[in-house]
């Protein structure tokens, strides 16, 4: 088990500047595996066994996506529901991701000032992406600080190249901002809805 799995979830990566540049930079990183969800599953069902094997083969997982209606694109949401099953990712017997590291890389057209308590949205980008940190907590994973680029519509080529360089550094060296305990949280006593 080694390396970083970068799961790219951009609905139109061929016409993306930022996510395409980040994915290309990650592909050039010897310790990274880039997995494009939209290219792998353009319109068919997601292969759960294949996806779980990819996750099991890596110790760091980074979900890379453009912020879409203050969340992730639909294919990534579908992927999470399909792959992160009770008994595998969480709940009784669900220890497959325990003590791995999860991170997100998010781009957004809105500028950074929009994502502040006094900004246009009244919340920070960390607050908007909190569900991903909660996913890490629920599955027993460490959580990296988010890698973000805001104001992408105004991003020139030099800023984009610098962002891609910083992204690779982040993929290789970022330390978790929240560490999982690694101890059994007695999830067997947690009641989960059935049906």
Model-inferred region functions:
Residues 1-35, 167-169:
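N-terminal beta1-alpha1 ligand-phosphate binding loop
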Residues 2, 97-101, 141:
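A short helix->loop->beta-strand "cap" motif at the edges of active sites that frequently abuts
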Residues 17-21, 46, 74-78, 158:
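Generic recognition of short, well-ordered alpha-helical segments
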Residues 23, 131-195:
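Glycine-rich phosphate/pyrophosphate-binding loop and the adjoining helix
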Residues 32-55:
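N-terminal beta-loop-helix "entrance" segment that forms/cooperates
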Residues 49-133:
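Helix-loop-strand module that forms the ligand-binding subsite of alpha/beta enzymes
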């Amino acid at each position: 088990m080694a390396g970083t799995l970068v799961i790219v979830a951009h609905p139109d990566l061929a016409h993306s500047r930022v996510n395409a540049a980040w994915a290309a930079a990650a592909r050039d990183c010897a310790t990274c595996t880039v997995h494009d969800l939209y290219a792998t599953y353009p319109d068919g069902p997601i292969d759960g066994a294949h996806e779980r094997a990819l996750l099991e083969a890596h110790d760091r997982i980074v979900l890379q996506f453009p912020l879409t209606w203050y969340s992730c694109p639909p294919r990534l949401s579908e992927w999470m529901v399909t792959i992160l099953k009770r008994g595998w990712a969480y709940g009784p017997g669900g220890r497959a991701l325990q003590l791995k590291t999860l991170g997100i890389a998010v781009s957004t057209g809105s500028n950074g000032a929009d994502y502040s308590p006094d900004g246009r949205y009244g919340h920070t980008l960390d607050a908007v992406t909190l569900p991903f940190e909660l996913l890490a907590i629920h599955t027993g994973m460490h959580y990296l600080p988010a890698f973000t680029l805001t104001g992408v519509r105004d991003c020139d080529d030099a800023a984009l190249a610098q962002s891609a360089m910083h992204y690779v550094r982040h993929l290789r060296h970022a330390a978790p901002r929240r560490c999982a305990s690694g101890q059994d949280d007695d999830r067997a006593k947690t009641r989960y809805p059935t049906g």
